[in-house]
Amino acid sequence: MSEVSNEAARRRTFAIISHPDAGKTTLTEKLLLFGGAIQMAGSVKGRKAARHATSDWMALEKERGISVTSSVMQFPYEGKIVNLLDTPGHADFGEDTYRVLTAVDSALMVIDVAKGVEERTIKLMEVCRLRDTPIMTFINKLDREGKNPIDLLDEVETVLGIQCAPVTWPIGMGQRLKGVVHLISGEVHLYEQGRNFTRQDSTIFPSLDAPGLVEKIGEQMLAELREELELVQGASNPFDLDAYRAGQQTPVFFGSGVNNFGVQPLLDFFVEHAPPPQTRETTGRRVEPTEAKLSGFVFKIQANMDPQHRDRVAFMRVCSGKFTAGMKTLHVRSGKDVKLANALTFMASDREIAAEAWPGDVIGIHNHGTISIGDTFTEGESLSFTGIPNFAPELFRRARLRDPLKLKQLQKGLAQLSEEGATQFFRPLMSNDLILGAVGVLQFDVVAYRLKDEYGVDAIFEPVSVTTARWVHCDNPKKLEEFREKNAGNLGIDAAGELVYLAPTRVNLQLAQERAPDVRFSATREHAHVKAVD
């Protein structure tokens, strides 16, 4: 086996997806804690204290207590290297989360035991479906009263359309919580309350028949449990590795992240069964992770990760080959050779200079405005990774300055923020308006906050008569020009120089589509096909 094959086989790159408040950031912390990456988990509840959760590091996030930007954390575990990509927890950040899901090989879905499958989880699941991403499920907050576990499995199967294979099963919940049974190994992990923030090893009995177990959980509960397990094992699916890796079955675990409970069995199972880096599609061919030459794509751009150094960092997922510090690569979109010096690896906000990286790893490349989302880097081959779309925004605002002299800073700020995916930015052909598009209202708050904080620009966002946007393409240049002339009042250019139809109403969009049958109106735009613009 080559060194690349060896290292790729050790990698497990995944993201955690959930509805806001299902306990995702807490679980992220606990995985890092069990992985030995942090000594003390900064519980999200302790916000007011100095101990902020390690993965929420932007000032706005610390103020609001939600993860707005996705961060990347790497830790070794049981001979494997785990790359955990945290995703924004707030409902408005669908697009950023979507892009993170393009960079992972599997996902972990967190569900609140009391609330079950929620709206945001359904949306994220749809995104995972597009790529058949393998998914494990952690049903969290078992220390509180919640829905019946059998009903929860049924809900996941019905609402999300994926088969459930329970791997651990709860012994009671809320006040009566006694532990979980591992359905594959037969072990019983006891629940011992204690919100200590250091690694906690629970008491484990080898089986339900082990001496001493009945004293711990009581005869009645043990009898109820045996009955329930018979029912569960008769009615549910046994774990099937191929079905899981094909995205058709989800192994299910129960636990309480805040109490460090049930996390260890999940992590052990994850590193053993989750897929290593997979084959990736490009515009020209399929790229295997074990290829000797480096290739990778940018799935996120983050401005000002370091307030001391007003910098921007492009997050690149390595897809094949080996990255070494200072190596020369081809930036495919611009056709220029770029030396990747001082690339970073991440442990949330702590950065270290990366000496090397392998398939599945994520590195940070310093970006001075030349790198965009979806850009591909190779060792010379001209190919572009596909499947990293921009979604048509659902909300629009016009940016207006309180101080008209700051126009240049506003344009620069909006261009940079749209490049990193915080918002989308459109310029109508027939006016000097600057129109922002977003998937949710909070995005506008974040942009306003960052414009003020990072660019010194005080901007107001006003309503604008745009309901939806579609990217327009036509194979016949003459017909496109005709369409452009007739519809100039509703057309604009996005930050990448692409033509966009800004529809004032859904009816208007429908009419425009009927009147121009040769023009394609798309609700998404592939990043891989973006032209370079100044």
UniProtKB/Swiss-Prot annotation:
Q: GO cellular component annotations, sorted alphabetically?
A: cytosol
Q: Does the keyword Repeat apply?
A: no
InterPro entries per the UniProt record, alphabetical? EF-G-like_DII, EFG_III/V, G_TR_CS, P-loop_NTPase, PrfC, RF3_C, RF3_dom_3_sf, RF3_GTP-bd
Please provide, alphabetically and separated by semicolons, the GO molecular function terms listed in this UniProt record: GTP binding; GTPase activity; guanosine tetraphosphate binding; translation release factor activity, codon nonspecific; translation release factor activity, codon specific
Example GO biological process term?
regulation of translational termination
What residues bind GTP, as annotated? 18-25, 86-90, 140-143
Give the stretches traversing the membrane. none
Pfam families hit by this protein: EF-G_D2 (PF22042), GTP_EFTU (PF00009), RF3_C (PF16658)
Q: Which residues form the tr-type G domain?
A: 9-278
UniProtKB keywords: Cytoplasm, GTP-binding, Nucleotide-binding, Protein biosynthesis
> Where, subcellularly, is it found?
Cytoplasm
- Carries keyword Nucleotide-binding? yes
Q: Which PANTHER family match?
A: PEPTIDE CHAIN RELEASE FACTOR RF3
- State the HAMAP family in the record: Rel_fac_3 (MF_00072)
Give the family from UniProt.
Answer: Belongs to the TRAFAC class translation factor GTPase superfamily. Classic translation factor GTPase family. PrfC subfamily.
Report the protein's function: Increases the formation of ribosomal termination complexes and stimulates activities of RF-1 and RF-2. It binds guanine nucleotides and has strong preference for UGA stop codons. It may interact directly with the ribosome. The stimulation of RF-1 and RF-2 is significantly reduced by GTP and GDP, but not by GMP.
Q: NCBIfam families annotated for this entry?
A: prfC, PRK00741.1, small_GTP
This chain belongs to the protein called Peptide chain release factor 3
